[in-house]
Amino acid sequence: MFEYIKLKNFKSFSDIEFNMLDRRNNPKKLILIYGENGIGKSNIASAFFTLSETLRTMDVRDLMEALISDETSLNNKEELKKYLRSRYKDIETIIKENKTVSSEGTMLLEFGFNINGKRGKYLLETNNTQIIHEKLEFTLTKKRGVYFDITESKLSINEKVFLDKNTYTEIKTACLKFWGKHSFLSILLHEINDKSDKYIRDQISDNFDSFLKFITRISCKIKFGSRQERGILGLPKEVLAEYESGSIPV
């Protein structure tokens, strides 16, 4: 569960922290936000939507490259590309849509969370075009530690996150190539989904696997203007994977 959100230069928020803890310092199971129109209620929900979008940019890259390379597949390719770009965005588009207009500083999103009593935080910071800082703190084995801390000049990934040296090296190499235009989490999730034998997933520590399941199972729906709505349904692949047939035990 989420414990707090910090947002800087995000939509209408120049600098805000939204606390989701109760009086006993535990995450609230239900939070209702109410108030007048235009005060930023939807922008808080948009932070979760934006987080989910940043996890998919590597998959978007593959999708667009495949479409561009196939010159004969579709007659209305430009219309399809326009549609895909509106639904599946690269990091620069995500920043452009969410960073406060005319803001001079960086945009920052920080999420505090609690998974099975273990607390952590995930930070994502951008300039006007790309990611410039990304960091995850969570329980490594018994104590809380830094999983990764990446900036434009530093690439620090804790080897304890992976059970296999080759996997660590493979992910680090991918980050050297793609990070900035894609987040570490997007790169890692793409590598996991790209391997049919699930090798990389098996080489991830249990606590990191718990975090990945938590962060990829966010579901939210937000409104754009008075008519348009968009949403993300975060479900494990085992759920609703086969639409043609199936059964639900009662």
Report each predicted region and the residues it spans.
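Short amphipathic alpha-helical segments, especially helix-boundary/capping motifs
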Residues: N25, L84-R85, E229
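Generic preference for well-ordered secondary structure
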Residues: F2, K28, G35, I95, ...
